[in-house]
Amino acid sequence: GLPLLDAYIRQSYLDNFLRGGYPFIMGGDKVVHLFSRKHGDPERDYNWFAIAGEYYSQGNGNFRDVCQNRRCDVRLHPGVKDYNVWAFYSFVQADGYNPLEIRPAAFRVRDMEAARRLLADSMYDTGAVAAVIEKDFTPGMVSGVIAAHEIVLACPEQELIDGLLRLSEQRAQASFVEGYWSDHWDYLLDLILDYLAVYPD
């Protein structure tokens, strides 16, 4: 390789995932951007951010910042596929505006009966985990309740979480915060180009 270019790519990769989050593939095709957060000087009030105090933590970030820092996700993590295109374009309104803030991704179980069977096969007392997945949840919430209740599993924890996510739909989330914006077309187009570079068909 080219040492200087390799060093540049390594640093850009680090910078991107410290802002846009590290794309972690779970449940076969679900993407959770770990450690995502708003970037900028933390001493400025408008750069406030919060990262969930849980396993598989995610944080909030501004639409533009997160979008621009995920523009190479597919080239570096092909398993991301069209997730970023789906997530960001889902927030664009008919008038071209999008909300300011991207919130951590959550999940909602589509087949609760199958999820209950999975829990029953995985643990003796399903109550605490069942209560978590009855509403929108994150992988960290499931992992946290298992740890807090010292639940003994009949399978690896990651296998259980993957199974729950396979039975769930992913819910991209955003928030108005200080307003709506409309100047992100180039960044949005970059998400499509990144996807097409790896999946041209």
Task: Describe every region a protein language model picked out.
Residues 1-201:
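Acidic, mature catalytic/reactive cores of soluble proteins
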